Each structure stands twice: as C-alpha cells, then as structure tokens.
C-alpha cells in the first residue's frame, strides 16, 4: 500500500530473482482513488525435479518511474525473501520384466531396469552384484547423470553353466549406490535387491562307450 496519495497513478513492478523457484504477480497499479487500499502480491512455488533443498529467492518491489507519479520516482526499492521448500526425494525404482527375473544355465539372459526418482545435481553411480556368480552374473555398474536421470537403464542377468545337478538356484542381485562416486543427496538411499532364478540344464545319467 502507498504511504501517501499520489496526484496520478503509481505503478509498482514486482520481480523474482529466481523464477525457477518462485514466480510473482508482475505489476500493481495504485490510483488517487485506491492508494490506501492494500493490494496482494501472490508468490507461487515452481516445481522442478532437482534435489536442491530449500531455496531462497529475493522478491523486489520497485516503482516504475516511467509510468508513475514523478513524486514517487526517488522511492527506493524494497525486497521480500521467499523460501521454496523442496518436494524431491532421493531414491530409485527397479522394474523387473514380466515381474520376475529368470535365466538358465544355457546362458540365457533376462533384464530389469533401474531409474532415479529425482534429478541429481551430479552423477549417481550404482554398483550391481550377484550373491552367486557361479549361477548368475550381472552388469556391474550403471551411471546416471543430471541429463539422463529419468531414462531407465538395463541390468542384464546372465545364467552361468556348470556340470552339477543342482536344480533351480536362486541368487540375490543387489543394487547399491556407490557413495564415494555419487551425489551426496543419494548417500543414504538404501540398497534394493532382485531375486534371480537359474534353471539347471544338467540331467542325471551315464554313457557307455564300446571299444572297437
């Protein structure tokens, strides 16, 4: 609201220092008739996918000299600090093709995907390991960047042959974030696991070979 009645209109320009975090009503116009009636500036939070915590923006209210009563030209700008609270949480999602992961000792493969739930400010590196590399091996690492964070990447599970009659064997595939090589916001994210089953290709029996 103005502190005194103007002889003509007074136009206030309102700007945000970071429109990626907060936008504002752009102008207010006071006249000799409404100068003492408060007008509202609406500040609106802007969503992004970046894990950036609470961000402060400076809202500046200034007199538009070219469109205002000359008596207000020398009035100094005033500012308000607006804080935008982040709604993005570090995490990742695994999706198994067909809802399960199965391979065979004949060397068949199956895949599941990994994707980040929020955009990091720097790389996030995953380490993938198999609890039994004698039954199933896996893609060893995945790297997500600020640019490809929302594009699912494949982890390939490959069955490993042996000569043992051991039936169907389950292996635990662990997907974990490599803290030392990843964005700090993801350091506390828990590991996730996938169970992979390997079907045996060995059959009990014996072979006779006749000499001559």
Pin down the residues of each PLM region.
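Short boundary segments that mark the start of a structured unit
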Residues: 1-212
């Amino acid at each position: 609201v103005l502190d005194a009645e103007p002889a003509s209109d007074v136009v206030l320009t309102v700007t945000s220092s970071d429109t990626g975090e907060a936008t504002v009503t752009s102008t207010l116009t006071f006249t000799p008739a409404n100068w003492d009636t408060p007008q509202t500036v609406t500040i609106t939070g802007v969503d992004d996918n970046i894990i950036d915590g609470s961000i402060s923006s400076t809202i500046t209210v200034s007199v538009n000299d070219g469109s205002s009563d000359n008596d207000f030209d020398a009035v100094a700008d005033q500012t308000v600090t607006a804080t935008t609270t982040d709604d993005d949480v570090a995490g990742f999602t695994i999706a198994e093709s067909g809802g399960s992961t199965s391979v065979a000792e004949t060397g068949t493969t199956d895949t599941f995907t990994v994707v980040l739930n929020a955009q990091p400010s720097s790389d996030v590196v995953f380490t993938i390991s198999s609890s039994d590399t004698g039954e199933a091996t896996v893609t060893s690492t995945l790297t997500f960047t600020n640019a490809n964070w929302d594009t699912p990447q494949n982890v390939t599970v490959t069955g490993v042959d042996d000569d043992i009659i051991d039936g169907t064997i389950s292996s635990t595939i662990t997907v974990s974030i490599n803290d030392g090589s990843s964005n700090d916001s993801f350091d506390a994210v828990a590991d996730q696991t996938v169970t992979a089953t390997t079907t045996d290709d060995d059959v009990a029996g014996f072979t006779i070979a006749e000499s001559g």
